[in-house]
Structures are given as C-alpha cells and as structure tokens.
Amino acid sequence: MSSATDHTSTAILAVDTGGTFTDLLLLADGVLTTLKVPSTPADPAEAVLAGSRKLLTEPRPHRLLHGSTVATNGLLERKGAQVVLVTNRGFEDVVEIGRQNRPQLYALVGHRPPPLVAREDRVGIGGRLGSEGEEIEALSEDELSALRDRVSHAEALAVVLLHSYANNHHEERVAESLQELGLPLSVSSRLLPEYREYERTSTTAVNAYVSPIMSRYLSRLDAESGAEAVHIMASNGGAVPVERAIREPVHTVLSGPAGGVVGALAWAKRSGFDQIITFDMGGTSTDVSLCPGRPLHTREFEIAGQPVAVPVIDIHTVGAGGGSLARVDAGGALRVGPESAGADPGPIAYGMGGRELTVTDAHVWLGRLPAEAFLGGERALKKALIEEPIEALAESLGKTPSEAAEGILAVANTAMERALRVISVERGFDPEEFVLVAFGGAGALHVVELAERLGAKRAMVPPDPGLLSAYGMLAAPPNREISRTLLISSRDLDLEMRLETTFRELEAQA
C-alpha cells in the first residue's frame, strides 16, 4: 500500500529480512510504498532482490538500506566458516577457558557451547609485547613464512596477540604475512583495540566466523540490487556502508532488531511519548528493549554463547513468535517454542505443508486473523487444515479445541511477559511509566494482554506494525563508533595531552 509523506523525492529502499517474512519500504517522490514477501532462508538474497523488483517496476536511482539476519543465523545455526586463530604461543586456549561465570550455576554437569575455533585450528606463534606495548620478544620471520602453510586449510583467519591495543605492530606484521593467502582476515587491533584478551579474542573469532557468508551475501546484494549505495543496519542503531559490513560483520549481529527499536522510538516520539518498551514479535522470536527517552546500549552481549564486545542496543530475545511450534511434552505439559515453523513450511494455516501447530494457527482457529486479509489478500489462510491437529492436541490435554488454542497463546504470552519483566522490573523500572509499543507481524495480537499483565497503562500499535523494523532503517543515522584502550595514570604530567591526542586520532579514524 502507499501513503503520502513529507520526505524528499530521493528514492530510498529499506529492506528488513526476518525469519519468516522480508519487509520492504520504498520512499520515492514523497510516497511511501510497502511490501511484505516470504523470506527465502536457503538463499536470503533472493527474497530481497525479488521484492525489490516488485517495488522498483522500472530502473531508477536509489539507495538501499538493509537489516539482515544472515550473521545472526550463521552463529545460531553454527553454519559459519572454518576459522584458524593465530595467537601468542601458550595462549591458544584463552577462547575456550573464558571467564569463571557459568550460565548453569547449579547444574551437576555444566554444558557450555563449544568455541567457534576448534583446538587444532588455534595456532600459537612466538613474539610478545608487554602491557604498555613494549616489545619483549620479536617475531620470527622464519616462523611467519612457515605459518602460511599451517593455516592454508582455513576459510577465514583471525589474528589476536596480547596487548595489541597498546601496540599493533606485531598483529599488522602477521596480517601482512597472511594477506597473500587471499582469505578473509580479522585483526583484533583493527576490530576491537581494547584490553581483556578473552572478549577481544571471542569478538574477533565471531567476526571471522561469519565473514565469508556475509561477504558472499552482501557482495551479491551490492552487485545485483542496482542501488547507487548500500548501507547496512548496525547493531548499535546506526547505518554503516556495505564495505564496512563486509569487513566487520560482527557489527550486524543484531541488525534487524536494532531497526525495530529505532523505528518504534521514532513513531512514539511523533505521538508524544519518549519512554517506551518495545515489543517486536515476529514469526520466529520476540525482541524486547527498554528506551527511557533513547535506546540503551551495552557492550556485554552474548550470542550463541559467544561474547561480543561491540556496542549494541540492549535487546532481550525469547524464542516465541507467530511460527513457534506447540507440543505436549513427556510430562503432559503444553510447550510453545523455541522451535519455529519459519517461512517454509510455515504454520499449518498457510497451506504450504506445515503439520505442526503454531501460535499463528491458534489465532486463526479462534477467529482473530481474517482468512482473506493475509499478506494484503495475496494469500488466504486455511482454517480447515487446523481442525485435525488442534483436536488431537486438545484430546491429549483433556480440553476443547478452543481451550487448547487459548492455552497455546497463554504459554507464549507467559514467555514474552517474562522477557518484558527482565528488561523493566528486574532493572528497577516501573512499566506503568512506559508505553508498550507493539510491532512485528504478531505484536498487535498480544500487546493488550501483555500490557495488562505488566501493569502498563498505555499500549501503542504504529501504522504497518509488521514493517516497522524496515521503517527504522529509514530513520537510522549513519554512524561510526570507535574505541581504544588507553592505560594511563591520573598523575601523569602529560595526561591531558595524551587524551587530546587520542581523541583526535579517534575522530580522524571515524
């Protein structure tokens, strides 16, 4: 559909790829045109390009803004590259030892996700720097020559040496030696020149792990989209050039959800509200974030059990969405998620071969989704297909089919309420003082009950809530965050001069 806006006539195409649907907005000649197409998980670029062709019926100059889940899914599904990590001899296991905190504190046998880099792919070399960047042991040129053969089987390389935040010369020399292999190369002093070697190593390994898949994906979009410029939504709420996203894909691991937060806050402020809790319920998961006038950021973030020490919008995610699967466990309890029907085959009501009940099917059974209005009328929902599975579930629960459907929604709401309380009540914020902003394809169907459970007095559903993350990309400013560790005593006579010099260098780099 289309709606008039006050924007300039510059053509901008914003695309948000979700687990179930890909959302597109075209802003051209003062008119905003929207489109939602099924995602293509096997080849995410296909849905983006196909949707773009539908909106851009004739070639015209335009810019592409894109939020992608490719890096996220690569990590969650462990479908990234084979990474070889080059580090100081004796420190090969830093990435596996990690910190002392344990996610399952009382488990008799704890389980931690394995590191992204296998033990045999962690290569230690000589050479050592001190904590102030002074050289203790020089690199061996003979060892660097032999190193190329030791890492040639890799699909991507990560270089992390101790104290490179204070002196990057050793890392740069190693990188120079490995460059001729032509492999994607992640260097910690370029990516995260900060102390704490575990977080720096983990972040660099994550970047290397998703680098090849993101490079292939974004390079194809850049080449085939026909856009004059391509910018990618970053996890911190800004937009970065596609070249940087290819080089540093770790900055895009929360790309899509960040767009939703930016878009929700923009709409809320237009409506006179600036204290909001965002509630983004899509087909696969639900993302929630608290914004006391602005998005909150964090640098203590984990994805798939891997610490990522880059700035991201503070977003909490649970595996409950419109496509979340409902089942009865061995103890007779009703469970919903985190498994999802995704875009293929999708919920049963889509008529695409799905056989397991989902949250969406429960809504269709209860008459909360009009069959003829799905995807703007392009596809009809098939309630009759749900009858047999919902009756089987109801029988196993000893309930009527409608009660079973209500139960599916209640279980999903409980998981989402818990996530909303984590970011509000558990952090000392009163939900009563915030507006709950619902978006995503399924958000509006659940927001009223969740607002009542939380005690929030107001709930807001923006126009086209299923497309709000794409709208957020239109509102996202270009930005570049640069950081560097500088260890210095407050008693140093040249403190102010060193700080001033460092800030000038950071500004020039940004």
Tell me what each language-model feature is.
Residues 1-510:
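N-terminally biased helix-coil "hinge/interface" segments that flank
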